[in-house]
Amino acid sequence: MAPFLKLGALLVGNLEAMSYGTSLTLFDPYIVNGQRVFMDTCWLPALDSAGIDVFVEAMDTAASAQCAVFTHEFKGAASRVPAHATAFGLRCDHVLVEILATLFDRSNKKEEQRHRQWARATRQAFSPIALPGGYPNFLVAEDADRVAKSYGANAERLIAAKRRYDPDNVFRSANPLPGVNAGLP
């Protein structure tokens, strides 16, 4: 955190231990029905100086004050569980980068495009230092290559389970699987 704290005056900040359930409620005040949110994601092997430079540049060029870049560290148990034991394919220490561009006025197509482009450009700026794929919860089926890389060797096993337990693709709005879009392959 030290490099971030040297960037300037901290407007809002809190570092403390909390339960997982409590952490899930932290952003509730900012999740408002009717707003438009563009999301993107990538994984970094670590948050080093190159990643911090991209982070700072992204926020310097943010489309609005409602844009944000969050990081979540995956370490400890998240990297000790064997990849074949769960659906989650990346089982090494890494940092999840979550990119959000929020727009309250859904009628302004120019601003919508500007926010969408900022999210995309931010992820692309991380690309040279990013790991393949991204956090599956934040990916869309149209990004098939990144979806496939996110699940790694688990993809085929997950697709087989999907075919078996959801042959009618009832849960099609859930996390995308490689090759599973509107219908099953």
Label the model's feature ranges:
Residues 1-185:
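Soluble FAD-dependent oxygen oxidases
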